[in-house]
Amino acid sequence: MNFKKLMASAMVCAFALTGCGSNTATTSEDKDTFVVGMECAYAPFNWQTSEKTDTSVKLGKSGYADGYDVQIAKKIAKKLGKKLVIKKTAWDGLIPALEGDEIDAIIAGMTKDKTR
């Protein structure tokens, strides 16, 4: 799969999932932030690193998040005029975090199936 198709697919998933949250700010952050949940363990899409790079985003006190998904999240946050916050979340915790207003979106290569 070429890079353009990959990025297009990631954008579609990201925009589709941003509408799944509520209209209120998340409980974990204020309304000036865009909180995105991802595993940070699936390179090259998203991963955790201890080193800051030109493309990484601070990941709490535990280093930095980087990857294609992080870049998509940065573009969405910029378009929304909000500060990006990446919340490292286990795969099984992503949907509950979204439904519980802990995050605003999931950007993690998640596809639709019967349970979602």
What are these regions (language model features)?
Residues 1-33:
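Short, low-complexity disordered leader/linker segments with a strong preference
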Residues 30-109:
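Extracytoplasmic small-molecule ligand-binding "clamshell" domains
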Residues 111-116:
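Short, intrinsically disordered, charge-balanced linker/junction segments flanking boundaries
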